[in-house]
Amino acid sequence: MENRNTFSWVKEQITRSISVSIMIYVITRTSISNAYPIFAQQGYENPREATGRIVCANCHLASKPVDIEVPQAVLPDTVFEAVLRIPYDMQLKQVLANGKKGGLNVGAVLILPEGFELAPPDRISPELKEKIGNLAFQSYRPDKKNILVIGPVPGKKYSEIVFPILSPDPATKKDAHFLKYPIYVGGNRGRGQIYPDGSKSNNTVYNATSTGIVRKILRKEKGGYEISIVDASDGRQVIDIIPPGPELLVSEGESIKLDQPLTSNPNVGGFGQGDAEIVLQDPLRVQGLLFFFASVILAQVFLVLKKKQFEKVQLYEMNF
């Protein structure tokens, strides 16, 4: 009897452990799937549209600056840095999903030329690893190694993101050529205003869906509001739901118009995109250029020596 009770207890504990594990997985998966840049990866085959617009701007409506810095030229099969700067006021707080205030996160997408890719760990120097920190980059798609994404990560620590990039070698990759290539980048700070399904997040302004009078404002237990708007002409009632986060701008009894803001705009972040150019330089061309410069310098030296020799001859003839 005791053995049976022990077995039942063990079975119950195992069942609980499995249930807890499943719950953690679901919560974690939901959190990850709702994070930038997963939205873009799930909804778009290519993050850069034909117009040049990066798709992240579809959800992050405010425009903010970014800056990209890359070398002017690189040699084949060389690791170099692509530095993305996402500036913002570190004192700012954003509205989180639960309506509370918190620090801003940042994220980025780097679109490299075909053949360029994330440098393997064994090719990254200790100095470069220190600059990168604990960032974990990933490819936009398994077959698009030239498009890298990162985020969301804490903005206070990673407002400057260093990408370790490996340049291609045309000797081993037929698609690579010694040319000038464009590099495109997009970076955001803070949460977006619209989800991919078109619904609003709580990090944006909410407008009235009807003209009328605010009859009642009900504050919900978990935060947010239900605003009852009655149309004075026909008595039709509309209820607008406001999630936790935005601050209410209207009061009961107030007359409002269609699309009038009911709340403030809590968004303090935004998205920006930029571009740069990089040259994949042929080593033979560099060697030829160096040889040319050396030849010019030697020619100048010989010319000076010849001139001095000629002056000495002239001086000698004059004295003679």
Swiss-Prot record:
Its main location: plastid. Keywords: Chloroplast, Electron transport, Heme, Iron, Membrane, Metal-binding, Photosynthesis, Plastid, Signal, Thylakoid, Transmembrane, Transmembrane helix, Transport. The chain crosses the membrane at residues 286-305. Pfam families: Apocytochr_F_C, Apocytochr_F_N. One of its GO terms (cellular component) is chloroplast thylakoid membrane. Its cofactor is heme. Gene3D superfamilies: 2.40.50.100, Cytochrome f large domain, Single helix bin. Heme binds at Y36, C56, C59, H60. It is a single-pass membrane protein. It comes from the Eukaryota. GO terms for molecular function: electron transfer activity; heme binding; iron ion binding. SUPFAM superfamilies: Cytochrome f subunit of the cytochrome b6f complex, transmembrane anchor, Cytochrome f, large domain, Rudiment single hybrid motif. It is found in: Plastid, Chloroplast thylakoid membrane. Binds 1 heme group covalently. Residues 1-35 form the signal peptide. One of its GO terms (biological process) is photosynthesis. The 4 large subunits of the cytochrome b6-f complex are cytochrome b6, subunit IV (17 kDa polypeptide, petD), cytochrome f and the Rieske protein, while the 4 small subunits are PetG, PetL, PetM and PetN. The complex functions as a dimer. Belongs to the cytochrome f family. Component of the cytochrome b6-f complex, which mediates electron transfer between photosystem II (PSII) and photosystem I (PSI), cyclic electron flow around PSI, and state transitions. This is Cytochrome f. It comes from Triticum aestivum. The lineage of its organism: Eukaryota, Viridiplantae, Streptophyta, Embryophyta, Tracheophyta.
